[in-house]
């Protein structure tokens, strides 16, 4: 695998577990974010167990397990307790990464930090992009939560919105020693999904061509591969 391909994380958004192996072993990427909240059977134990069997595939990519709640425009409609239990079972099944929202209390975050999985703490703003100071305060808050990687995604309405978000990557590294993924969603923010890699983000999120995007503005796997080749990354 080339360095450029290792920077690409494919987002698996699918109601069915059929053909899961093809996406977990998809060529030309380095990771898969599995949006388990999109699964039709996520609210039942058997449905989740059937899906998690895919984590036993020997040749799969590392997986970032995500069960996004409705409050962050995710598909999980059960109780918060049930959602956390689903995440715990996903870690026990062998997911290498777990994505957790930054509004979770410490007593929920702590067991995940102590688990075998690495933790992404994420913050999403689907309404817009705050000013620079509130964004930096948000990074400061995320950095206190003990994650391996911080993630901030806001919705861009102007080109300048992207610049404020992208500057969080070197800011977080310099101030807190934190690896940070920071980009903007939406049509105006699309280019930041490439630029964040050039600024030092460890990976960026793309969609599989056959599947829906997990957030507005995502490139396909092939599009991001081409863009990385054009700019000479990796």
UniProtKB/Swiss-Prot annotation:
GO biological process, any: chorismate biosynthetic process
Pathway: Metabolic intermediate biosynthesis; chorismate biosynthesis; chorismate from D-erythrose 4-phosphate and phosphoenolpyruvate: step 3/7
Active site: 124, 151
Residues at which 3-dehydroquinate binds: 33-35, 68, 193, 214, 218
GO molecular function per UniProt: 3-dehydroquinate dehydratase activity
Job description of the protein: Involved in the third step of the chorismate pathway, which leads to the biosynthesis of aromatic amino acids. Catalyzes the cis-dehydration of 3-dehydroquinate (DHQ) and introduces the first double bond of the aromatic ring to yield 3-dehydroshikimate.
Keywords noted in UniProt: Amino-acid biosynthesis, Aromatic amino acid biosynthesis, Lyase, Schiff base
UniProt family annotation: Belongs to the type-I 3-dehydroquinase family.
Protein name: 3-dehydroquinate dehydratase
Subunit structure: Homodimer.
PANTHER family in the record: 3-DEHYDROQUINATE DEHYDRATASE (PTHR43699:SF1)
Organism encoding this protein: Syntrophobacter fumaroxidans (strain DSM 10017 / MPOB)
Classification via HAMAP family: AroD
EC number: 4.2.1.10
Catalytic reaction annotation: 3-dehydroquinate = 3-dehydroshikimate + H2O
InterPro entries with a match to the protein in the record: Aldolase_TIM, DHquinase_I, Type-I_3-dehydroquinase
């Amino acid at each position: 695998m080339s360095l450029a391909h290792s920077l690409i994380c494919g987002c698996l958004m699918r109601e069915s577990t059929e053909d899961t192996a093809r996406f977990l072993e998809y060529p030309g990427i380095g990771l898969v974010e599995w949006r388990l909240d999109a699964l039709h059977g996520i609210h039942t134990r058997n449905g989740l167990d059937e899906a998690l069997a895919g984590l036993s595939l020997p040749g799969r990519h590392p997986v970032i397990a995500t069960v996004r709640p409705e409050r962050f425009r995710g598909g999980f409609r059960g109780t918060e307790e049930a959602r956390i239990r689903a995440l715990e079972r996903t870690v026990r099944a062998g997911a290498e990464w777990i994505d957790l929202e930054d509004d979770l209390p410490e007593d929920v975050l702590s067991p995940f930090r102590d688990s075998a999985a690495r933790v992404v703490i994420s913050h999403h703003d689907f309404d817009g992009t705050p000013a620079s100071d509130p964004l930096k305060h948000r990074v400061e808050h995320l950095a206190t939560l003990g994650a391996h990687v911080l993630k901030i995604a806001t919705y861009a309405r102007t080109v300048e919105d992207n610049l404020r978000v992208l500057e969080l990557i070197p800011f977080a590294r310099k101030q807190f020693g934190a690896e940070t993924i920071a980009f903007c969603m939406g049509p105006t923010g699309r280019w930041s999904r490439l630029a964040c890699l050039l600024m030092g983000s460890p990976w960026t999120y793309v969609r599989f061509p056959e599947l829906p995007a997990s957030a507005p503005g995502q490139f396909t796997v092939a599009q991001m591969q081409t863009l990385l080749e054009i700019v000479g990354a990796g």
